[in-house]
């Protein structure tokens, strides 16, 4: 491994919001590195290849992969279990199996990964930046471009400006939205959003929704993307009330497995509003990771500015403490 982003999803496992698989488990799911060895049955891969790891594997054969929805590949059923697709394990301590987070465990200096989770990238790319597209950037960008289907002239609200929300801002801006509205109570996150494409920022969702109505003749936003740190019922309800008729709420944030969504049924039917889930921003890793990195190389997607602090692996707990304190847009472990 060369680098790994500190994503909130790993923290969700420690809090129980996401059920962990086999414990103990080596975490990390947003990483990039250089191939040091290849096993059998891996044509097309060589020692020295530079790769971004995808926390969602793609078999290329199932219904979802064949339909262009690689993020829903059937192999993803093992993402939270910690084991390989054949039920075996690639890590152990004193003979005891160790689970691999998302099958890739990027919080390790070395890891064993199935080729289904590897995306080969340009060796000239800085891997400490490229690692971010493996989750946070791809998830946020795709939430705006793919799930919300942002278009020129639209009004898009992004609720929660962290490692995912900031990239939804970039995606909505790149798609040509006229009003890109970022919502976060932390001032430095609002300032960062303004520098990366947000046209307006607000500390509260109420203020953002009021502004959206003021610039759309009272209709509301075309889409509201929920990228809060921990999803709560009220987040979806607030987003739902902020969108226009036939508008879309994109739910990207992760909450407790028992968290429920409650919205007015009347508006759902008579206003034809839509609630759309988004896993990895409805992106297909093998297609969209290289594309996003090409955008980075051409200056249309900014990655360097996302990294607030870099850490050594031994300082991972400090990195997550900084995340909880609202100090980081994205922390990155550099090996």
Predicted segments, located by residue:
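Redox-cofactor binding/interface segments in oxidoreductases and associated redox assembly factors
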Residues: 2, 53, 158, 225-226, ...
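Glycine-rich cofactor phosphate-binding loops and adjacent beta1-alpha1 units
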Residues: 148-151, 187-274
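Cytochrome P450 core scaffold surrounding the K-helix E-X-X-R motif
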Residues: 9-14
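C-terminal hydrophobic helical "lid"/dimerization subdomain
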Residues: 206-207, 237-241, 282-335
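Glycine-rich beta-strand-centered segment in the early N-terminal region that forms part
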Residues: 2-4, 17-66, 71, 79, ...
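Mid-domain Rossmann-like dinucleotide-binding core that forms the NAD(H)/NADP(H) cofactor-binding site
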Residues: 50, 109-110, 116-118, 122-210
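Local beta-strand N-terminus motif with an aromatic residue
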Residues: 48, 153, 198, 220-221, ...
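Cysteine-cluster motifs in flexible loop/terminal segments that predominantly coordinate metals
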Residues: 55-116
């Amino acid at each position: 491994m060369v680098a790994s982003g500190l994503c909130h999803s790993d923290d969700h496992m420690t809090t129980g919001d996401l059920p962990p698989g086999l414990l103990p488990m080596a975490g990390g799911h947003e990483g990039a590195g250089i191939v040091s060895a290849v096993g059998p049955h891996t044509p097309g891969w060589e020692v020295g290849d530079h790769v971004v790891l995808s926390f969602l594997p793609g078999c290329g054969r199932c219904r979802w992969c064949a339909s262009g929805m690689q993020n829903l590949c059937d192999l993803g059923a093992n993402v939270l279990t910690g084991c390989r697709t054949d039920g075996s394990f690639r890590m152990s301590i004193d003979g005891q199996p160790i689970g691999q987070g998302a099958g890739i465990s990027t919080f390790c200096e070395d890891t064993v990964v199935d080729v289904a989770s590897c995306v080969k990238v340009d060796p000239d790319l800085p891997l400490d930046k490229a690692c971010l597209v493996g989750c946070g950037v791809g998830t946020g960008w795709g939430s705006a471009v793919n799930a919300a289907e942002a278009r020129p002239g639209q009004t898009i609200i992004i609720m929660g400006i962290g490692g995912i929300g900031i990239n939804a801002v970039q995606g909505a801006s790149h798609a040509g939205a006229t009003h890109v509205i970022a919502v976060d109570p932390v001032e430095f996150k609002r300032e960062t959003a303004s520098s990366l494409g947000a046209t307006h920022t607000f500390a509260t969702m109420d203020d953002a929704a009021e502004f959206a109505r003021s610039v759309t003749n009272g209709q509301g936003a075309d889409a509201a993307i929920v990228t809060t740190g921990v999803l709560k019922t009220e987040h979806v309800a607030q987003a739902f009330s902020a969108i226009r008729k036939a508008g879309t709420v994109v739910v990207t944030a992760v909450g407790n497995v028992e968290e429920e969504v409650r919205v007015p049924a009347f508006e759902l039917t008579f206003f034809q509003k839509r609630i759309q889930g988004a896993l990895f921003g409805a992106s297909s890793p093998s297609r969209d990771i290289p594309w996003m990195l090409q955008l980075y190389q051409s200056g249309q997607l900014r990655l360097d500015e996302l990294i607030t602090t870099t850490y050594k692996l031994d300082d991972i707990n400090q990195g997550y403490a900084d995340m909880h304190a609202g100090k980081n847009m994205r922390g990155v472990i550099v090996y």
